[in-house]
């Protein structure tokens, strides 16, 4: 009886842990350049060479062209994902310390038209 109770208790803890585990804020998608990180809509995510120290350097008109992958106020870092505070006070997801963005000129899933723009924008890869 003790063995069965211990197994049932362990299973309950495991299910509880899984239920409360936060999922990653990105997905992995396919593109002509291989695997890329995507947002929840499947749009390619990018990183910016001018971002430094976990801080976004893309604000104002830059952020209009390169919308940040926003994080909700109650979002929590998970695994390789962290949250940075933008100059406007908004929250943005970062992967391995690099803030993540979409590109306004990508129109469908799998597009990677922002890769290499001005030699400072690159696809985010898993």
Indicate where each model-derived feature is located.
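Compact beta-sheet-dominated domain cores in extracellular/mature segments
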Residues: 2-7, 17-126
């Amino acid at each position: 009886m003790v063995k069965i109770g211990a197994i049932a208790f362990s299973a309950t803890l495991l299910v509880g842990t899984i239920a409360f585990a936060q999922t990653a804020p990105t997905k992995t998608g396919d593109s002509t350049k291989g695997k890329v990180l995507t947002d929840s809509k499947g749009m390619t995510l990018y990183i910016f060479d001018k971002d430094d120290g976990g801080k976004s350097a893309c604000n104002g008109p830059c952020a209009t062209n390169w919308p940040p992958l926003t994080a909700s106020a109650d979002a929590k870092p998970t695994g390789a994902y962290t949250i940075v505070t933008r100059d406007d006070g908004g929250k943005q997801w970062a992967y391995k310390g690099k803030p993540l963005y979409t590109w306004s000129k990508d129109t469908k899933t799998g597009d990677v038209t922002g890769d290499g723009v001005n030699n400072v924008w690159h696809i985010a890869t898993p």
